[in-house]
Regions:
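N-terminal helical hairpins
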Residues: 1-3, 19
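N-terminal core-binding DNA-recognition domain of tyrosine recombinases/integrases
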Residues: 11-24, 33-110, 125
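Short, leucine-enriched amphipathic alpha-helices that occur as contiguous helical runs
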Residues: 29, 75, 134-137
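Conserved helix-loop functional segments at active or binding sites
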Residues: 61-64, 88, 121-128, 159, ...
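Basic, Lys/Arg- and aromatic-enriched nucleic-acid-binding interface segment
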Residues: 94-150, 154
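Short linear capping/connector segments at secondary-structure termini
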Residues: 98-105, 171, 204-208
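Conserved tyrosine-mediated DNA breakage-rejoining catalytic core shared by Y-recombinases
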Residues: 155-191
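Major-groove DNA-contacting interfaces characterized by cationic-aromatic clusters
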Residues: 189-208
Length: 208
């Protein structure tokens, strides 16, 4: 297999991640590679094959399969990282704004937007009642996790979080979602998870 090949680049990077025991991140790259190879229909993918048109078609392919935009973003960011590494060592050509027209951000899917002041009050108002405090913490986490639905929050399992990455399947569509856990969510996550019984498979206590 040619060294100037995207597949080689990903596999090499996955090996480095595993050596550093970053297994969850390595799996994320493995999933992105498997998906992109399936789309391309080939085992070898020269870096020259990756252009704006290919990326746009890949994005359309993912969306047509029912993938959420945040999942599309994760795949695109994985491809972008490997491509940029190849550019640095001269294995791939530098193409300005190569990923400009594909989604690489984080989308918050709130069907009805709250006024910013109302949102601030919901998230920061002092609460003394334990049940209300739990509800407030859940709301904050749903917001910080890119607008996660409560049913998905309730069904999160303990093994869904590894190395700062949250991976779960949406209850509604079955789509795989992967998001990096923001620093401001960690305290809330630990606080809410502390109420879960040790033998429960779920991360939070809502289904107990």
């Amino acid at each position: 297999m040619n060294e100037n090949d995207f597949v080689v680049g990903v596999l090499t990077y996955i090996t480095c991640l595993r050596e550093k025991k970053r297994y969850s991140t390595a799996k994320s790259y493995q999933d992105a590679l498997r998906s992109f190879k399936c789309f391309c229909g080939r085992e070898e993918i020269p870096y020259a094959y990756i252009n704006r048109d290919t990326l746009l078609r890949y994005q359309s392919w993912l969306l047509a399969k029912g993938c959420a935009r945040n999942t599309v973003s994760t795949s695109m960011r994985r491809i972008r990282h490997i491509y940029n590494l190849a550019v640095e060592v001269g294995e791939a050509a530098y193409i300005p704004h190569l990923f400009k027209n594909v989604f690489t951000g984080v989308e918050s899917k709130r069907k009805k937007a709250l006024p910013s002041e109302s949102l601030r009050l919901l998230m920061t108002s002092p609460v003394t009642d334990p049940q209300q405090k739990r509800t407030q913490s859940a709301f904050c986490l749903m917001f910080l996790f890119s607008g996660m639905a409560f049913v998905d929050l309730a069904h999160l399992r303990k093994e869904d979080i590894k190395e700062g990455i949250l991976s779960y399947y949406r209850q509604k569509s079955g789509s795989l979602i992967q998001v990096e856990i923001p620093a401001e969510a960690q305290g809330l996550l630990n606080e809410l998870a502390a109420d879960t019984t040790e033998d429960s498979p779920y991360l939070f206590p809502f289904l107990e």
